[in-house]
């Protein structure tokens, strides 16, 4: 069973201000099968870059001035996701960005299910000092360029694989494992 991880970086606090996106497809063994990364030009009205955001991800307005916008990238992103479910670390943020951009650009909301690796990590490792992706990546000795959307997506998948503890062969097995922990697949846009 494959799954896709996703991460966005934003220019400011608005979810529509995405300035980069990273996706990674994994198989059940934790092998990265494919990746997708792009800088993204935020739409007009959402394109102001805040200093705090630049400090976090290092992306500046000049970096995205010739980048494609979400309207151009969405068909490629949607194709990459395919029928797989999504995983994001702090999914409320990343799924909020995705749903906001889909609505803003007038696309139909796709039938996408997702899980939050942050929520799962809190249930699986309740005594961890921190459940931030940076802290978990360091704990597991993962190479990591924090706040690069592709690195965030890849490490999200690696943490998710560890949290699922070998239960990724069949979706029903994964669902049972998660339900016992009070976690269910959610639907995008709901």
Residue ranges and their predicted role:
Residues 148-162:
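Acidic, divalent-metal-coordinating active-site segment for phosphoryl/phosphodiester hydrolysis
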Residues 1-100, 104, 109-111, 133-147:
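Conserved non-catalytic scaffold segment of RNase H-like nuclease domains
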Residues 101-104, 123, 139, 159-166:
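Active-site catalytic microenvironments for nucleophilic, acid-base chemistry
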Residues 159-190:
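Acidic two-metal-ion nuclease catalytic site recognized across multiple nuclease folds
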Residues 109-113, 131, 169-172:
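Short, structured loop/turn "capping" segments at alpha-beta junctions
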Residues 114-131:
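Short alpha-helix plus adjacent loop in nuclease-associated cores
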């Amino acid at each position: 069973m494959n799954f896709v991880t996703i991460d966005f970086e934003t220019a400011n606090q608005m979810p529509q201000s995405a300035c980069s996106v990273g996706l990674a497809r994994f198989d059940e063994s934790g092998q990265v099968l494919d990746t997708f990364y792009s800088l993204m030009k935020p739409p007009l009205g959402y394109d102001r870059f805040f200093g705090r955001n630049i400090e976090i991800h290092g992306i500046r307005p000049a970096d995205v001035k010739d980048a494609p916008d979400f309207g151009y990238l969405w068909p490629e992103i949607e194709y990459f996701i395919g029928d797989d479910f999504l995983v994001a670390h702090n999914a409320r943020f990343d799924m909020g960005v995705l749903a906001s951009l889909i609505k803003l650009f007038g696309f139909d909301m796709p039938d996408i299910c997702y899980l939050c690796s942050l929520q799962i990590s809190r249930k699986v490792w309740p005594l961890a000092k921190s459940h931030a992706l940076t802290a978990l990546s360091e704990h597991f000795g993962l190479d990591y360029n924090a706040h690069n959307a592709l690195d965030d997506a890849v490490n999200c998948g690696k943490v998710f694989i560890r949290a699922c503890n070998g239960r990724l062969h069949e979706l029903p097995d994964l669902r049972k494992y998660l339900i016992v922990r009070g976690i269910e697949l959610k639907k995008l846009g709901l």
